[in-house]
Amino acid sequence: MSNANLRKWVGFCFVAIYLFLGVPLWYKLTTVYRASLPINYIESLQNNKFQDIHLVIPVYVKSDTYRFPDVHDAIQVQVNHLLNSQEQRVPWSLQVLPYNETIEQMESEGNQFHVVTLKLDEFIGYSSAYDTKETLVYYDDAAVLSNDLPFFVAQTLVEHTFQLEWTHLNKTCEGVSTNNDVAISYDPNIHLSVTLLSGDGNPVAWEIEPTLTDYFSPFRKFLSPLVNFTVDSSIVYHNDLNLHSLNGSCTSVTWFDLSHTIDLSELSSMAYYPEDSALNLAIVFPSASSSPDGLAFINGTRISDEITTLDWNSYLVPQWGVIIINKMPLKPNSVISEDYLEPMMYRFATDIFQLLGLTEGSQDLLSPYITIDSFKRLTILQNLDKATETLWSLVKLTQQFQGMSIPREVSDNVIEALDLRLQIIDLLNDPGKGGDIVWNNALHLSNELVKLCEKAFFNGEMVQQNFFPQEHMIAVYLPLLGPISAVMFFGFYNVMKEKNQKSKKNGTEREVAKEKLELKEAQKLHAIDGEDEL
């Protein structure tokens, strides 16, 4: 094979490899996979987050004395009138139904419903049960004769029993969240860290395990449908949070004064826990060396009329927990008994309601079951709102970065989240449901919905791909493609140049040969020197 043909075959192989192997391989390695997302549907949800929600809460009415066959219909009319008098941010209503044996049987199995019991009495009033979701409405015969009973029951339900919904779901409220400056953001899993701090290094012990078992475990069980607490305890020596510097400064110290003295960041970072949210209980004893006579600003705490004044003060730290400061230092080898810790646990349990957003300020939780039930519904709506915001952020992110990959897993998570959202809405909109089981299930599903949306948004493969834009791809492949392309280009140029030169040479040779042929023919015809002979 000649040198020219060999060069042609080599060039052809280069071109074939470049076109049939290099280009598909380059396209495969540089193409960013972008799974499709329901962008239009997510955008419609963002524009109107509660467009397909109408929260329905069933309420069952029963009477102990008189039988009112149509009282639930009359109450329903008054309830609708009250609810329609206020523009709602999230549509919601009460479905007033008669109490029957089916509901009674379901309640006996542990599935509690909202029940209104009408009781004949000498006065008109209402009261909410402490350990159930029952509302007692007291009426007299005059209220029956004047037909004022339905309105009074409706007013009690809307403005008192469902006061949280009435307040947070109207148009004037900024959002459905019950969080304030004190409460932490809602999380279904919360870690509780209980720490004993001693200003001295003397060994101490405390009966924290039986105290938590006897006094905090029932509280955990009560709140278990709402939050799941994990608890750890520890003892820290030689740390009184610098409280001795406040000794003698004033007779009354508030949390504002403490915030300028103590540093809780070190205490918060001592324990590792997998939960995203945490609450803290710090029980502090001063040092005997720096405060031998105790802390003068501790005036004592009075839990109730039955319990005498205790030698410690409790301070609620916004979005952190509770600090309990004892007046006197511990003696060496002291053992803090369960009886001493019991009032502290009682006070801490009371403050937890405020830290979770169930109460505001020093407000007492008079009907905890009703309040927690309302808090579940508001949390469900809050989770739906949060999930929609997360999905919309995902859509905006993918639209802003066109080079970002959208893995199939992200698309599957989004579709699953939207299906789960519809499942939650079916539970909220069904007037035939509304017991503890339904609200607990809806809350659990809404927590899973938030996790799914966050999983889709923080997908590792999608975020990692964002760090390799098109400019980086060119920078990576150009050192490889550049030399190969240059060799092929100049090789092709040289081949074409040689081909042109050879074509010119062949053309010149053909012209010379043609002239020689014409000359020979002219000689045969004796046409020499340009003269023709006949």
Swiss-Prot record:
State the annotated membrane topology for this chain. Multi-pass membrane protein
Record note on quaternary structure: Forms a complex with CDC91, GPI16, GPI8 and GAA1.
Source species, domain of life: Eukaryota
Keyword Glycoprotein found: yes
Similarity section: Belongs to the PIGS family.
- Please give the GO cellular component terms listed in this UniProt entry: endoplasmic reticulum; endoplasmic reticulum membrane; GPI-anchor transamidase complex; membrane; nuclear inner membrane
Q: Which GO terms describe its biological process?
A: attachment of GPI anchor to protein; fungal-type cell wall organization; GPI anchor biosynthetic process
Q: Which Pfam families match?
A: PIG-S (PF10510)
**Keyword list, A-Z:** Endoplasmic reticulum, Glycoprotein, GPI-anchor biosynthesis, Membrane, Transmembrane, Transmembrane helix
Taxon lineage: Eukaryota, Fungi, Dikarya, Ascomycota, Saccharomycotina
Which pathway does it take part in? Glycolipid biosynthesis; glycosylphosphatidylinositol-anchor biosynthesis
Residues assigned to the Lumenal compartment are 30-472
Q: What function does this protein fulfil?
A: Component of the GPI transamidase complex. Involved in transfer of GPI to proteins.
**PTM characteristics:** N-glycosylated.
> Transmembrane residues, as ranges?
9-29, 473-493
Question: Which ranges does the record list as Cytoplasmic topological domains?
Answer: 1-8, 494-534
**What cystine linkages occur within this chain?**
none
Q: What is its main location?
A: endoplasmic reticulum
What is the designated name of this protein?
A: GPI transamidase component GPI17
Subcellular location, in the record's words?
Answer: Endoplasmic reticulum membrane
Q: Does the keyword Cell cycle apply?
A: no
